[in-house]
Structure formats: structure tokens, C-alpha cells
Regions:
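Short coil/turn segments at beta-strand junctions that form active-site/ligand-binding loops
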Residues: 55, 100, 132
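Solvent-exposed alpha-helices and their adjacent loops that cap or buttress functional pockets
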Residues: 36, 50-51, 96-98, 127-129
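Soluble metallo-hydrolase cores and metallopeptidase-like ectodomains found primarily
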Residues: 1-70, 85, 89-91
Length: 229
């Protein structure tokens, strides 16, 4: 490329001078693919409900990764595994059961196009249409602010949760910390909402994680939750 020299943070590690463009450039790529066919696995566990066993709340996170996966997906998967451990131990100690059935899922082959979760949804579509109440997804997590998107039928419910859970860094509620950031937002709508109310608004779900099969294929109420930036 031609044009001005790129600032230091924009430069890569090649022994060339990085420019910002515009300008003519030709690039030659040599691509190699692995076409091996290998099995992939979903791991499913159920805790049957005491009153409404045929109503399912499904909790999922994928277990595959491009590399070592410490951030994506392990930072989300360990949370789901801890939820399952706590609930199972509590049930053993007290005899407690959830009113609805909880389905815990660790999905395979998310990175290759949501294969594990979508294939499971397609295989069990009739049963899911009858029984699935909601799907709750996590993926990669980090430090920062609570972020959630989902079906807006869940917004009032999640607003109550966000106002009752303490943020692990600041000691205020998770909703209050999000509001403190939004009050300084450059987006006028976000800032205006924060000035008027502490209500936690769910963003719309896009695509790219394992809620897609549930939400976009079958129209099941869904949510994606995480912490970050």
C-alpha cells in the first residue's frame, strides 16, 4: 500500500514499512486445508423437574476451541460446570429439585459453524417445540461489564437479576456498574436511557454462538450472557 506510514499500534511484525493506503496492492495467498472427517460430541445432562418435568430450561456453552481455549470457550464453560456442580450437590444434600427440568449442554464443533448445537436442535426439533421454555447461552468471558442480549420477554426477569447480583470488581450491583458506563457513552440513546432509568436493557441477539439453532431455527426464547470490555 501507499499513503501515510501507519501508526505504531497498527503495524505488524513483517520486515516492511506499513502504510495506511490507498494504493494498488497485490497479495498472493497459499491456502492449506485439512479435509479429515472426525467425530464431534455433545455432552448432555438433565436434572428432572419436580413439578413440570416436560418444561425444559436449557443451559449451554461449547467445549471446542481454535487453540487452547482458555478464553473461548473455557471461561464460559467452567461457569456452566460450576452451576451444574452446585445444583447437583445441593440436590443431593437437601433433596431439592428444580420445578422445571434443567438441561445442561456442552456443545461440540461450535467453531466450525455451530455444528454440534444446530445438529442437536434439528434432531430434537419436535420435542424442543413442545418442551423448551428457554435457552441460556454463554461463550467467552472476561473482566469488565455484564453484557446480555436476548428475547425481550426475558428483559424484566433479567433486570431483576442484574440489580440483585453484586459486580465482582466494584462492589455495586451489576446493573449499576453498567449504568455508570452508559452515562458516559458517546451514543446519545444509550446515554439518555441511563440518565432516565437504571433499567437493564437486553440487546438484540445476532448470530455466531450456540443460541442460533434455538432462537433462529425454532423461535425458542433465548439469551446470551457474558462479561467483557
Amino acid at each position: 500500500l501507499e499513503g501515510p506510514v501507519a501508526p505504531p499500534r497498527w503495524r505488524g511484525g513483517l520486515p516492511i514499512t506499513y502504510h495506511m493506503g490507498p494504493g494498488p496492492a497485490m497479495l498472493h495467498l497459499k491456502l492449506e486445508f485439512n479435509w479429515d472427517i472426525v467425530p464431534t460430541y455433545n455432552i448432555i445432562a438433565k436434572m428432572e423437574g419436580s413439578e413440570f418435568p416436560d418444561q425444559w430450561v436449557i443451559r449451554g456453552n461449547h467445549h471446542d476451541a481454535w487453540v487452547h481455549g482458555a478464553a473461548d470457550p473455557i471461561s464460559g464453560l467452567v461457569v456452566e460446570m460450576e452451576e451444574a456442580r452446585i445444583l447437583s450437590e445441593y440436590a443431593k444434600e437437601t433433596g431439592w429439585r428444580p420445578k422445571r427440568t434443567i438441561v445442561f449442554a456442552a456443545w461440540g464443533s461450535e467453531e466450525q459453524g455451530l455444528i454440534g448445537s444446530v445438529e442437536w436442535v434439528e434432531e430434537h426439533a419436535l420435542e424442543l417445540r413442545e418442551k423448551a421454555v428457554a435457552y441460556i447461552n454463554t461463550d467467552g468471558n472476561g473482566a469488565g461489564f455484564l453484557g446480555a442480549g436476548g428475547s425481550h420477554t426475558l428483559e424484566t426477569f433479567f433486570d431483576e437479576i442484574a440489580h440483585s447480583v453484586t459486580d465482582p470488581i466494584q462492589g455495586m450491583t451489576a446493573a449499576e456498574r453498567v449504568r455508570s458506563r452508559n452515562l458516559m457513552s458517546s451514543n446519545s440513546l444509550t446515554r439518555s436511557r441511563a440518565e432516565k432509568s437504571s433499567h437493564y436493557y437486553l440487546s438484540a441477539l445476532g448470530s455466531g454462538s450456540d443460541y442460533s439453532g434455538f432462537f433462529q431455527h425454532l423461535g425458542i426464547t433465548s439469551m446470551n450472557i457474558g462479561y467483557g470490555g
